[in-house]
């Protein structure tokens, strides 16, 4: 009985400690997070597309637009942990052969790492990527802001973001796909790793709209 109680207390403590350092931006409050801004476009909380709940962040962007996210919740702890990084779901309306570029910057505005994400699809795609392990960020770096840079040659587009999180522990199931690359190469440890990962996604992911 005491052993079971200790396990329960430990699990609760872990959950609380994780919530202190990490927050999932699910956009269910119905308003754009404070300080988020785009220089060429419009940010809107929308119920048109969503991965969880009933809302997501709709971004109507124009050529060369930049969305700036200052001091995102959880980013400091994510930087300090070798497994820290970013999780997100992206919905793209019109496929293009250009990238959405996540640029991570320190207090001076210098880029410390980046993640190109190819927009050649329509629908939802996920991102699970580590700052140090996948984006080659130095362990001494500290991220203060995030820039999401939109295509340079495509005139305009609409993209949605949901369940954005800067976390101290990116899932071990992360792997490269058509949209972005990670440095993981040990998939052979699990037979049919891709089938296993996709099964986990189906089990753990909420039912999306579209």
Q: Which residues fall in each region the model found?
A:
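Bacterial N-terminal signal peptides that target proteins for export
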Residues: 1-8
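Extracellular carbohydrate-recognition regions
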Residues: 21-38, 173-199
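Extracellular beta-strand elements of beta-rich domains used
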Residues: 146, 162-166
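Short beta-strand-plus-loop segments that form exposed binding edges in beta-rich domains
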Residues: 148-155
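Short carbohydrate-recognition loop motifs
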Residues: 46-66
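Conserved small/polar residues in nucleotide/adenosyl-binding loops
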Residues: 203-210
């Amino acid at each position: 009985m005491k052993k079971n109680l200790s396990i329960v207390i430990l699990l609760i403590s872990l959950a609380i400690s994780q919530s202190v350092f990490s927050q999932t931006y699910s956009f269910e409050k119905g308003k754009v997070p404070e300080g988020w801004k785009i220089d060429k476009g419009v940010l809107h909380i929308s119920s048109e597309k969503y991965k969880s709940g009933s809302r997501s962040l709709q971004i109507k962007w124009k050529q060369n637009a930049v969305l700036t996210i200052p001091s995102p919740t959880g980013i400091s702890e994510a930087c300090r942990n070798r497994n820290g990084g970013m999780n997100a779901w992206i919905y793209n309306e019109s496929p293009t052969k250009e990238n959405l570029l996540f640029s991570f910057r320190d207090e001076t505005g210098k880029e410390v790492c980046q993640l190109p994400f190819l927009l050649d699809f329509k629908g939802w795609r996920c991102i699970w990527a580590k700052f140090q392990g996948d984006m080659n960020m130095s362990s001494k770096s500290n991220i203060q802001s995030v820039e999401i840079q939109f295509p340079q040659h495509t005139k305009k587009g609409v993209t949605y973001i949901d369940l954005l999180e800067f976390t101290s522990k990116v899932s071990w199931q992360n792997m490269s796909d058509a949209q972005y690359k990670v440095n993981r190469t040990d998939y052979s440890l699990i037979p049919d790793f891709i089938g296993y990962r996709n099964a986990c996604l189906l089990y753990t992911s909420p039912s999306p709209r579209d």
